[in-house]
Amino acid sequence: MVAPRSRVLDVGCGDGALLDYLVHFKQVDGRGMELSQAGVNACVGIGLSVIQGDADTDLADYPSGAFDYALLSQTLQATRDPKGVLDQLVRIARRAIVSFPNFGHWRMRWHLLTQGTMPVTPCLPDAWYQTPNIHLCTIRDFQQFCAAEGIAIEQAIAIDGQGRVAPIRSYRWANIFGEQGLFLLSRR
C-alpha cells in the first residue's frame, strides 16, 4: 500500500520493524512517533528517525500535508480519542493506513458466548485488566465510522489467522472471519 520513495510517518511504531522495512525495501523517507521510551531507543538504535510522542496530543503539531502516508498499525484501539487521531492522520498525510484487531471475529464472539470472558488470542495477548486496548471495534464499526466522518476508504483488507488476505468489499463475511482489518484512507 505504501509507494516507494514516499514520505511516511509511522505513529505508534513500537520497535520500528515496519518503519525499518519501509526505509530499506521501499526507500521511503520515514519518520516515527512512539509513546514508550524503550520503543524510541530501539528505533534510534537501528538508525531510524523516531521521536517520543503521544498520538492523542502530538499529531496536532505536524503541518497539514506533511507526509504522503501516515501509518497507525495495531494502535488505534489503544488511543484515548480514536476520532481525533484519525482526523489528524488524514490531515497531516494524503493517505492513512490503519490496521486494528477485529473484535467482531467469530472466535471472539464464540469465546464471549461460551466462556463469558474477554478472549486472549495471539493477536490480543493481554488479559482485559492488562491490555492497552480501550476502544474496541469491529471491521463494520470502522466502516460506518469512516462513512459518518467523511473519511474515504480507498482499499480495505481482512486478514485471517493464517495471514490470508481478502478484499473487504468483495468478501461478505470479513467482519466474521477477518482477525484484523487493514484500511487505506483519505479525506473526502
PLM ranges: what are they?
Residues 11:
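Conserved beta-strand/loop positions that form the S-adenosyl-L-methionine
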Residues 15:
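Conserved SAM/SAH-binding loop
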Residues 58-64:
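Short conserved loop adjoining the S-adenosyl-L-methionine
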